[in-house]
Design a protein with these regions (language model features):
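A short, aliphatic-rich alpha-helical micro-motif
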Residues: 1, 71, 297-301
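Active-site neighborhood of phospho(di)ester-bond hydrolases with catalytic His/Asp-centered motifs
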Residues: 50-52, 75-82, 103-105, 162-165, ...
Length: 398
């Protein structure tokens, strides 16, 4: 039916919703293409719902669930993740299906009580526990800190589906199709990197542990809580999460700068031109006062080279630069090649603070930082051209 599409034409239904209203995810990250909150229903001898949706969409969601159940009751709700964009409708669901058993781990249940006051009708699972629903056998694997402590993933042994919570998720609504084979997925890949860098970025090690755990499973379909159901591109989604969580940047440079009156920006332009002259094609520039930090983080996770420029502002870094750097620092981004530059009018502080940032991140610093006093002089312009010859392995060395 139009209300709920059967993911497999065999008992697994998509009952998620699109959010085309919200401007900022987590009230921070822009959503130009919206976002989906995905929920899945297994209609077997027993009925199992996996995760719910944001409470704002509970009416649409509950109708989809009721339509797919077609008069049957709901036996189990599996809670892979307690974040309110997925757990927000649990209380209303329980009101509608008072006998539903809520499946989770002990960390889930602490949050369930805290957010929803629910303490009854709980079905606790531990690592490797199973739930048989008739044709389907579900196995539960803990995935702590991907990206909350209670997170677990549910593997359907029968259909080889992993219900992966936020892992392998992406921004972007589902515009018609639900499965990747029914749509053009091109625009989701950049959005997946942006989603990863914004939401999951800090938790590279836990993601690696979760990937290790899942590597022994035959995964043919990934049902994440955000974005398309991955079937044709399941291995590509896993590969992106693998590369991101190892902080493995691709060839390229992101130049991040702040500039009040354009002097630091001129330095950034000169450095970019020099990089291009030296054969670097992937160069992205971000004016911190204009680019949302969401997109800056995406490029920092994507590319191996990071160059930061800042004017001095009251003996500190330019505040907007400082704000972006604190978000990068929070995510503990590793393995970057770092260059920096700055400007000042009477007392320079930006360059030494950028140097300290590079050290704190344990990044490899290259080149000679240029510090410009007042307007960009011819000498300093030449220094900008020479300062950051980002050394990529040339074909003959490779």
């Amino acid at each position: 039916s139009s209300a709920a599409s059967d993911v497999y034409k065999r008992q697994v239904y998509y009952v998620g919703v699109n959010d085309r209203q919200k401007a900022l995810f987590e009230n921070m990250w822009p959503l130009p293409y919206g976002v989906s909150y995905n929920s899945y229903l297994i209609v077997d001898e027993k009925t199992v719902l996996i995760d719910t949706v944001d409470v704002c969409y509970s009416d649409i969601f509950l109708k989809k669930v009721a339509d797919a159940l077609d008069g049957r009751s709901l036996d189990y709700l599996v809670v892979n993740h307690m974040e309110p964009d997925h757990a927000g409708s649990i209380r209303l669901l329980r009101q509608q299906y008072p006998d539903v058993q809520i499946v989770g781990n002990n960390k889930t249940f602490g949050m369930l009580e805290g957010y929803h006051g629910i303490k009854e009708g709980l079905f606790e699972v531990k690592e490797g526990d199973t739930l048989n629903t008739g044709r389907h056998e579900l196995v539960f694997y803990m995935a702590p800190m991907v990206h909350w402590p209670e997170v677990m993933v549910t593997y359907d042994v029968t259909d080889k589906i992993v219900f992966s919570a936020d892992a392998f998720g992406t921004y972007g609504t589902l515009d018609g199709g639900v499965i990747d084979t029914e749509m053009n997925v091109e625009h989701y890949w950049e959005e997946m990197i942006r989603y990863y860098s914004n939401i999951v970025g800090k938790y590279g090690s836990p993601v690696q542990r979760a990937l290790q755990k899942l590597s022994g499973l035959d995964i043919q379909t990934i049902c994440s809580t955000h974005g398309p159901v991955w079937r044709e591109y399941a291995s590509k989604a896993i590969d992106i999460y693998d590369r991101m969580s190892r902080y493995e940047g691709e060839e390229g440079v992101v130049i991040i700068y702040g500039s009040m009156y354009g002097n630091t920006e001129q330095m950034a332009e000169a450095i970019a031109a020099s990089l291009a002259d030296n054969g670097i094609k992937n160069i992205v520039m971000h004016n911190v006062s204009k680019s949302p930090s969401s997109y800056i983080l995406k490029d920092v996770f994507k590319y191996k080279g990071v160059i930061v420029g800042s004017p001095t502002y009251s003996n500190q870094l330019f505040p907007e630069v400082e704000a972006v750097l604190s978000k990068i620092e929070l995510r503990e981004v590793k393995n970057r090649i770092f260059g920096y530059f700055g400007s000042f009018t009477w007392a320079g502080a930006a360059v030494k603070r950028l140097a300290a940032f590079g050290e704190k991140m344990k990044w490899e610093t290259v080149g000679t930082p240029v510090e410009q006093k007042q307007g960009l002089s011819a000498t300093k312009y030449e220094e900008c051209l020479a300062c950051l010859l980002y050394t990529s392995p040339s074909p003959r060395d490779a």
